Amino acid sequence: MTHNGTDSTDLIIVGSGPAGIAAGVEATRHGLRVLLLDENAAAGGRVWQAIEARGAGDAEEDNGLAMIRELLISDARIHHGAEVWCIEPYGAGPGGTVFWNENGAARSARASRVLLATGAIERPMPIPGWTLPGVMTVGAAQIALKTAALVPDGNSWIAGQGPLIWLYAVQVLRAGGKLGGILDLSDTAARWRALPRARRAMPDIRKGLTWIDEIERAGIVPLRATSLQAEGRGALSRITFEVKGKKQTEAADLLLLHDGVIPSLQITRALGCGHVWHERQRYWRPVTDAWGETTVPGILAAGDGAGVGGAAAAVFSGRIAGLGCAHALGRIDGATRDREAAPLRLEREKALASRLFLDVLYAPRAFVPDDATLICRCEEVSAGQIREAAARGCQGLNQLKAFTRCGMGPCQGRMCGATAAEVLARARGMHTREIEPLHTRFPARPLTVGQLSELEQEP
């Protein structure tokens, strides 16, 4: 497919979070023509979302704001509100054509290199009652806080594990919001397993302890809990959980869940990129070389979309990918590329040091959702239906579509794929990495017939 007005450029970057911004700055600095596409209204991704409008809140956000401003004064062309729905790699060489929707119209552009900086998504956390109105993710609530200054009030609870629950709780309290409580669902034994990696993660550990201290000084004592359930008729009204084996019930009209993040793989899967299993955090990530290039020539991945490492590491991986593109397209020689990349690699390793600690401390907990718990919200497929399909011989997620329609709804498996794989693997007595992942296909976003008709078949 191609569009009558197909543009041509050196590098197209999909996503304007830390990795995409850094790659854009680095690539334009070396003379590449850069087109940056992002579905949000402004640059920053999730971690620096709406930072231009609300201002920086700490030193890390100061650095992010400075990078965004550097990108804005560069020669990069930036398109916001651009939803990428297809990428067609060149058959004869690296690069490809990118198709996206913008202002209701389909557009396309060609590039010698395409960098995917699509970030991460929250890991699904299907507890009983998670589909009730009043239950949402911490990430979604944080977006509401950053973009619209909306904060929880009344009987609002945070539950789960990972740094985000502590950061968000502090942000809520500083913004004048109220919390009923925080449930820490992490594994107590994981603290001891993570201890050998703590020394290199001390700056982040101190930051986390400062957050927890601020939360406790506000009168909120986090509870270490298990067996969480959301309950209510038509909407959330209470939560039940266990603390030291004793069941407790609390009134709640908002429950915010979080169980870490995993790479967003919809585009890399659809492109046919190779992927490798990350055992500690139980997710797939694209295979990349030292410069971020995937197994599809000319298609690169950087940042959390190439493996969750956090914002600081994403910045350095984006800059390294930008250098790789500049060399591949003849703007700098190999010696210059390697010399400039060397300190970036060292800084990235420093940034990733704390990630090794966090990966063990907040390793995904093995869970066994009861048969009635919905796994696929779009098609209303329960854990019990997945187990029944396994008993009937279902061997992978693509077969599961035929058995149950799991993964065939509007989200195309983004919300259920990881959980469905875990349930199916356990039911079949297999490791999750042995379960065939979903075969994702383009279009990656909803597309109208009218938008599609604006494109014509290439002769």
Name each model-derived stretch.
Residues T2-P410, R414-P459:
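Residues forming the flavin
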